[in-house]
Amino acid sequence: MLRTVEPDDIAIFFEHQDDPVASEMAAFPVRDRAAHDQHWAKILADESVIARTIVDDGQVVGNIGSFVADGERAIGYWIARQHWGRGHATRALADYVAEVPERPLHARVAEHNVGSIRVLAKCGFAIVGEDQSDGDPVREIVLRLDA
């Protein structure tokens, strides 16, 4: 189930991202508490962001959201590692794309994160390319949902 992000969720999101295994899988740096809170304050203040908390049986299991970057709506999500493999990402993404009608939606995933690539494909995203920023060791798979 998706719901609006509540202030108490931010501390839970911090715990989720403070996991080196999950951080490596997502190719996203672990932030200290101050940087994490500042990051979420910026997210929630940005009117282009549509952020949701992912809840299962009353427990926060992750978050999903989209934002506008370079004129394109990009989507991202995070599932706490202890909840991986239970279908939360697929259900959340399916619900999210049903809620957010704007198309196309874009996603970038570290190429080693095959689980996330599968989730996006199940929800209709197609691989449209690959990218690697200068100096960044992580190659990304670029996906798009058109309909």
Name these PLM-found stretches.
Residues 21-41:
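Conserved GNAT-fold acetyl-CoA-binding loop/helix
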Residues 42-48:
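Short loop/turn motifs at secondary-structure junctions and domain boundaries
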